[in-house]
């Protein structure tokens, strides 16, 4: 399922876009405030961001800039600003596309399909030379395959799929061991250590960072 975040202060427009996207089987979150939108964007992984420029508290350009510092996820700007310098600024700040309001919803849907097609296949993830092939169920580093248990593999994949997003131990536990698991959160620390030990011969162990008091992130 493709997850999309819309940050748009025109609530009627945001709801209309949400309705159309939901009809196309996308999962949609909406924020009407710039700060809330930025917080949501940086706290949860999405497959696409749709941003207005003129927003309360934090403008869309700043949101675009901060998202682009963290991820290569596609960004589409939708705005009433039609001047060339506005378009140039939006694209220079990291947007993949720029649509001027008012627009036809079919055009927006087509542009969404286009930017999503340009994204690499998520079944193969490349994290600084750590290649994770979901279909083949294998991990290679510098051409060498790592011998991982299923739990180690699942843990690495979850972190990689949420690259640059800090995951709490409880979140990791839910994803890897299951929501009804009675495993304690310190087991996550144990398996992180296992993973780092297996990455150490390739000088990749520091790819998994500890965020003290919170959890882990892979960059």
From Swiss-Prot:
Pfam families: Response_reg, Trans_reg_C. One of its GO terms (biological process) is regulation of DNA-templated transcription. One of its GO terms (cellular component) is cytosol. Residues 122-219 bind DNA. Residues 3-116 form the Response regulatory domain. InterPro entries: CheY-like_superfamily (IPR011006), OmpR/PhoB-type_DNA-bd (IPR001867), Sig_transdc_resp-reg_C-effctor (IPR016032), Sig_transdc_resp-reg_receiver (IPR001789), WalR-like (IPR039420), WH-like_DNA-bd_sf (IPR036388). Phosphorylated by ArlS. It comes from the Bacteria. PROSITE patterns: OMPR_PHOB, RESPONSE_REGULATORY. Keywords: Cytoplasm, DNA-binding, Phosphoprotein, Transcription, Transcription regulation, Two-component regulatory system. The modification 4-aspartylphosphate is found at residue 52. This is Response regulator ArlR. It comes from Staphylococcus epidermidis (strain ATCC 35984 / DSM 28319 / BCRC 17069 / CCUG 31568 / BM 3577 / RP62A). The gene is arlR.
């Amino acid at each position: 399922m493709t997850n999309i975040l819309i940050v748009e202060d025109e609530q009627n427009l945001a709801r209309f876009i949400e309705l159309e996207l939901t009809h196309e089987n996308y999962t949609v979150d909406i924020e009407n405030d710039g700060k809330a939108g930025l917080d949501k964007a940086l706290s949860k992984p999405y497959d696409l961001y749709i941003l207005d420029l003129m927003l309360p508290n934090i403008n869309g350009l700043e949101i675009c800039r901060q998202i682009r510092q963290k991820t290569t996820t596609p960004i589409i700007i939708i705005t009433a600003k039609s001047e060339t310098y506005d378009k140039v600024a939006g694209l220079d700040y990291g947007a993949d596309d720029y649509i001027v309001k008012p627009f036809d919803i079919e055009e927006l849907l087509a542009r969404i399909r286009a930017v999503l097609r340009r994204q690499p296949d998520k079944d193969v993830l490349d994290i600084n030379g750590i290649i994770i092939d979901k279909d083949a169920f294998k991990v290679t580093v510098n051409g060498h395959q790592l011998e991982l248990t299923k739990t180690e593999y699942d843990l690495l994949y979850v972190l990689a799929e949420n690259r640059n997003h800090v995951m709490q131990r409880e979140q990791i536990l839910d994803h890897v061991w299951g929501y009804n698991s009675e495993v304690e959160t310190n087991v996550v620390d144990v398996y992180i250590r296992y993973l780092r030990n297996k990455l150490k011969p390739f000088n990749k162990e520091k790819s998994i960072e500890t965020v003290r008091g919170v959890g882990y992130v892979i960059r």
